[in-house]
Amino acid sequence: MEDRQSRLFLALILSMGIWMGVNYFFFPPTPKKTSETKEVKVDKPSDDKQDQIQKEKKESRTTIPSKGTKIIPSESKKTLVVTESYIVEFSSLGGRISKFYVKDFTGPNGELVQVARKDPETLIVDGKTYYGVELSREKGFDFNFTDSLNELPHSEWNRIPFSLAENKADHSVVFSAFSPDKTYQLKKTFRFFDRENYFKVTVSVINLTKEKLSFASQKNVQYLRTFGSLGPFPKDRPLNDRDTANFFRFYHLDGSFNDTLDGSSSVGFWSSIVNFFTGNSGVDESFSLKTSTGGVDFAGTGSRYFIAVADPLDHKPQGIILDNRPKNESGAVLVYNNITLGPGEVYNLDFASYVGIRESIGMVFHDPELDPSQTKNSPFAGLSSDLNKSFNQGITTPFRNGIIWVLKQIYRFTIPNYGWSIIIFAILFKLVFYPLNQKQAESMKKMQELSPQLKTINEKFANDPKMRQQKTMELYKKNNVNPVGGCLPMVIQIPIFIALYTAFSDTIDLWNSPFLWVKDLSEPDVIWTSPAIPYFTQTGIGLNLLALLMVGTQIFQTRMTSVSMDPNQKMLMYVMPVMMLYIFWNMPSGVTLYWTFQNVLSIGQQWVTNHLKKTEAKKKAV
């Protein structure tokens, strides 16, 4: 998820590669878009223009439910569908999913995949007790049309009572409602499968007249809202910036994957940097319309650990609308501008839908007859082979997946605690990269041995920086010392560090996992929060013990490897720990724990190297 993680990547570049231009190592390249892809900016229409649009829509022969429709609460009916993975509550008001719960489920190899890990709700259905996490933020998922951008995220259809028919045998729910003038019927079928994390949605438009019906056209665009902003979200406090940074929308268009934060401008982070230096305002309109002749492959919404994807199976929507208004919850909205029905014709739109964890294990089919890669006539025939890009982390994805696999094996076969798993993994990582780390330690030791001579050069040429630099480089060359030898091993490992961050930040296994005094390895280690500070912060400032320990070990390591140098260079040596404190202050404590223990191991390795060098020097002196 390039746009959402780019700030972190930039910080890591500045911290680890401050002396070297290695930016291109860190960021997965954005796939090249075809020349057929178009981006159209859509601004919120004025009142006069909106009246004209509505007039044109009436002339183009499409009707929508009236805003004056009255709803009688008793007319709203609810029903539940329970599968191994889901508990789904439906409402006849709008014919929609009103609540969507995910549960623990069985993986393809029979393993239990824990999903309801943190603050699960207790649900009693037919006398049985279940535990689930509600993902629709209790605002539901629609699959309803609207022809007005101003109605996003809630369609007028959401206020219309639908008839409800349920077939418990095959876990299907069917809703239907008529347009106010009875010219067409909207029918929605939700079908679930007991052991699968996929379900199928069919939206049908039925022409009830003996005339041709233009349901969607260039003049009368229809917007289909599938999934809204995804949860879960904290119920005991308001959302903060750290929370909202994990809520995003994504789409796959013309072979290119893109994502943006919920309710944010579609101008990306790097584009905003370019706009700053070029003087371009970069301001987005209220809505951005992405269209293409190739159509939309799939679209969805996501949060830190979960995604919801709608994959059109038998058709390609003409585009996707991005709602850029602050704090909107419009989610994934598909665009249709070419639906015409003959007399009595039924027009079906089939979707394969997935709601679950952001891991490939969740997208594996259990039943071969449902798997479109194994069964030609599967209900999910036409499923996109690129759905895994919904949680793709770029070029570091293979490393991330490998790290998660190793962590799970350590957890399984040693101590069943992810804190200890991270520590054991840090030791294994240090052993694997021992040759590089040892080269770094030896390089720093050589620099220390030259400390007296460097001090002499600095004092002698204190007022001549050019000559001081020249003499310093001559000293390095004479003693066969590479001044960047200590940095190179770290630079080589940077892609691995990025993979470690994504592994520790996004894997659901760390969610609500405690370690020693740390309550949750997926959250910052806040041991105390100050009272609110007027005019500065309304929530107080958290004290993160693990982050302080991390920067303490970083400073100690820096002092161990420091050599004589001028004051400016000495100041640079302490820039990294300060930057690291800023970066890690609000990071998941699992990441901070790993980095802290890596520092401890590096300190130990440097001490052993220094001790061995001293012993060797004494032997040579004798």
Swiss-Prot record:
Keywords: Cell inner membrane, Cell membrane, Chaperone, Membrane, Protein transport, Transmembrane, Transmembrane helix, Transport
Residue ranges crossing the lipid bilayer per the database entry: 8-28, 413-433, 484-504, 532-552, 571-591
Compartment(s) of residence: Cell inner membrane
GO cellular component, one term: plasma membrane
Stretch list, region Disordered: 33-70
Principal location: membrane
Subunit structure: Interacts with the Sec translocase complex via SecD. Specifically interacts with transmembrane segments of nascent integral membrane proteins during membrane integration.
Function: Required for the insertion and/or proper folding and/or complex formation of integral membrane proteins into the membrane. Involved in integration of membrane proteins that insert both dependently and independently of the Sec translocase complex, as well as at least some lipoproteins. Aids folding of multispanning membrane proteins.
NCBIfam families linked to this entry: yidC_oxa1_cterm
Protein name per UniProt: Membrane protein insertase YidC
Species of provenance: Leptospira borgpetersenii serovar Hardjo-bovis (strain JB197)
Lineage: Bacteria, Pseudomonadati, Spirochaetota, Spirochaetia, Leptospirales
